[in-house]
């Protein structure tokens, strides 16, 4: 075990004194028969800017450390061999290159000020996909010259975290520099897993930057939130996305040279318009578009069709978005379970916001099912809450459960039609909205109001047999008006009518 004056060598795992650690490491570097694997960057100096995947334990958790910047003589060769996705290559290298989130990283941004004052402590970054959470965390590490470790809650165990904590404490002891741990999808950790960060954060031994797309109030421990201020990253504007895409085109032009196709402004405008502020999705769509254009000229319509067919893009703000949710709603209304599941899957697998679908199902429960099955509204409301608490991808079955129940439920639009009749009546009869309320059903909280006749003559229904009384509730000016279950002529579907005729 390594004590206060001892540390474990990251190469051979041998425990040596702090005074002997550097000579001990030098012996490994000079030994030509040493390990063939790269030495951990644990003890290296402040010359790291990019990220290298490595393992921190035998569990092989996906952890990223900062790696050395290549020398100028090798830079050109590295660029040609760079096979990272465009979304990764286009990440900004400094806060000045960062696009969007002016309130956080602009000239007077709160996070920029904290960095400049060297007071950047643990925090939670909350924002939708593609708003720049990971990029911001990496820039904080580079700007503060901190050791940076990137992990994901989907693939990291508690044992991995404990190993990282141990290494971080040793690193702090040796260098005096803290480690920034970027925990992506922090909401995927359960509350017990989140608790292991509390002592490390509280003592300031590590800086935790957690990223989440879910509401921290529902998904994170209150103890963790109290120690990590929450910063909200707003959805990128269309102009923000255009700026990012234009910069990416320049990078691709430098990389591809003469083989870089011409990307028309209309393509940039289209991608930035339909990706709904998701920079990662926009860059992926741009990369795919460039790949298609390199094979030959294509029109904007061809690009649109290929992107949608490939599921690289789901139009969350345009026609596809509204057409799909409309088809889903109508399939539920028509009690077609298969179509309901199809359109639900099409939306979720293409990146639709699950809460948007859940909200629509709450509406369906009242609009299309209503009093035919009053249990559907509580079910839909519970589904919305469950999706908030669980998040994707686990929430997919929860949404499917509710969707199938709604499709199979009996249908009634009596409430929907009745309230529409009220709205139409008030719109066409402006005076009806100011009609005098009958005195006997008015509120009479004071003696003066009672003396004026408020509440006088009111018959309290529970005091009467079966609650039946002769009593008027509507204002005199609209007495006798009917809204509920107005007579309506129901049509018979011609195809069903013909089918009945054919079977006779």
From Swiss-Prot:
Does this entry carry the keyword Translocase? Answer: no
Please give a single GO biological process term from the UniProt record.
DNA-templated DNA replication
Q: Where are the zinc fingers (UBZ4-type)?
A: 6-33
SMART domains for this protein: AAA (SM00382), ZnF_Rad18 (SM00734)
Q: Which keywords does this chain's UniProt record carry?
A: ATP-binding, DNA damage, DNA repair, DNA replication, Hydrolase, Metal-binding, Nucleotide-binding, Nucleus, Zinc, Zinc-finger
Instruction: Return the annotated region ranges for Disordered.
Output: 55-90
Matching Pfam families, A to Z? AAA, AAA_assoc_2, MgsA_C
The residue ranges flagged as biased composition, category Basic and acidic residues, are 79-90
InterPro entries (UniProt xref)? AAA+_ATPase, AAA_assoc_2, AAA_ATPase_RarA/MGS1/WRNIP1, ATPase_AAA_core, DNA_pol3_clamp-load_cplx_C, MgsA_C, P-loop_NTPase, Rad18_UBZ4
Q: What are the disulphide bonds in this sequence? A: none
Q: Which GO terms describe its cellular component?
A: nucleus
Task: Spell out the molecular function terms from Gene Ontology.
Answer: ATP binding; ATP hydrolysis activity; DNA binding; enzyme activator activity; single-stranded DNA helicase activity; zinc ion binding
- The residues the record assigns to binding ATP are 129-135
Q: Which domain of life is it from?
A: Eukaryota
Its job? Functions as a modulator for initiation or reinitiation events during DNA polymerase delta-mediated DNA synthesis. Has an intrinsic ATPase activity that functions as a sensor of DNA damage or of arrested replication forks and regulates the extent of DNA synthesis.
Q: Write out the similarity annotation.
A: Belongs to the AAA ATPase family. RarA/MGS1/WRNIP1 subfamily.
Q: What is this protein called?
A: ATPase WRNIP1 homolog C26H5.02c
